[in-house]
Amino acid sequence: MIGDGMGPQQVGLLTHYAKLAANSTVPDRTTAIEHVLNEGVVGVVMNQPHGVLVADSAAAATQLATGQYAGSEMIGANYRGEQVENIVEVAHRIGKSAGLVTDTRITHATPAGFAAHEANRESENEIAVDMVDERVDVLLGGGLRNWVPDAVNDPESTAYAALMQLTGGAYPATSRREDNRNLLLEVRGDYQLAFDRVALARISSGRVLGIFADSELADALEDRASLEDPKRTEPTHVEMTAKALELLNQNPTGFFLMVEGGQIDWAGHNNDAGALLHEMLQFDDAVRTVYEWVKNRDDTLLLVTGDHETGSFGFSYAGRPIPPATRLEGGLFRDVPFAPNFNYAPPQLLDQIHAQSKSYFTMLNEYDSLPPTEQTPERLVEIVNGASAFKITRDEAAQVLTRAKNRNYVEGHPYMNTPTVPRIRDFESFYVYGENLRMNLLGRVVAEEQHVTWGAGTHSSTPVIIGAYGPREVIGGFGGMLHSTDVGQRMIEAISASRPATATAAQPTP
């Protein structure tokens, strides 16, 4: 299982909340990730691709899936550009089944690294074709736009009407394809198709392609808000994971399953601590589902790791406000007060961070949907303060909305192609995602109250943690200091062993 962007700091945030928050929602205050780490073997994983220090999700996933060093942004290739066999292909070659589950697009970098071969991660239309050609047994996530023909972009077209009939109108659709291939129709004879959670629940055997959104699935905060809604159409992470286990386990030879918590990464990119905590909680729920399934078996290997860390996140101590001096009962403090020189971040912050009800992404989408005359600092204050325990002022909202020349501007670049961007006053080179920089600025505005610091809007080189849980003779190889290629090689060795062994890998995305 892969928490995309899940470094040790993100695991620390989750664990702090579980253990120290007064209103922790974690069962017995013990996360599933903690169970895996305590009951299995723990390793530390370097993740740099060939020739660089920092990994993107495509190279990171490719290294985990193949056991070979990749180049940045490559999918399913080694650093020389040669197509290399991935663990899904290994599983199929030896008669096992394979599945991929994500809360992002099925064609996004992390799942792509396990089942496709393309020169660049941006080739999502081609990645979808690769997945069809590989006949991955279970594919669950979002991203319909890469599977349906270009004609779908006209909502008045017969193509759009036919698609709505096929999907039951589960959600509005667009297309990013530049041809008229409808991959859904191409696979319909080989796969059962599901576009909502009810249809997914009905499937009890066989291959399944479940696509539940035009792009990514709802984020963890949206999921929490809609969980009890009888009209909810999207399956949860837990529901997708449980269904994948149910279907793949029907192969007596065994299976490989990769489950990604992809929006951990996105919360890190956006410097959104509240969303990050909820994404970690949601991913941990999926880990718990697999842990409970695995714990009474002797034939299954569960790996929980990150592909890289995102945002250089952390709690930090601060120079203000300095807490008042207090008296302690211990004899050492009989004549002196307990008076730390700095504010070391009280645990009450954890419940306040958890109280956030919308991600920064949702907040800014609401702001952008206002009529232009209403897109004012005052309205941004209303939106943010209505969804967060950390309130902002009009002046702070104005800071979030202030623009400046884009010093990273590159004409035609997929991300850095706008002449102006929200104004970042330092480390501009590490904030590259255009209008999303407003979210980074919002994270900075509340940082002092949260005691949260962010080092970037991109990835860091921080090593990640891996927890291996399962048969003792298998998990030992995942302890110690490793590189992600070591993890990939040992996963392939484990699934290729003569003893029926299942590898379940979990990771983060860039």
Predicted regions and their residues:
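A post-motif C-terminal structural segment
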Residues: 6-12, 16-62, 108-508
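Glycine-rich anion/phosphate-binding loops
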Residues: 77-85, 122
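Glycine-rich phosphate/pyrophosphate-binding loops
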Residues: 88-89, 93-112, 499
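A glycine- and small-residue-enriched flexible loop/hinge segment at structural boundaries
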Residues: 52, 56-79
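Short secondary-structure capping/junction motifs at helix and strand boundaries
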Residues: 71-74, 96-101, 139
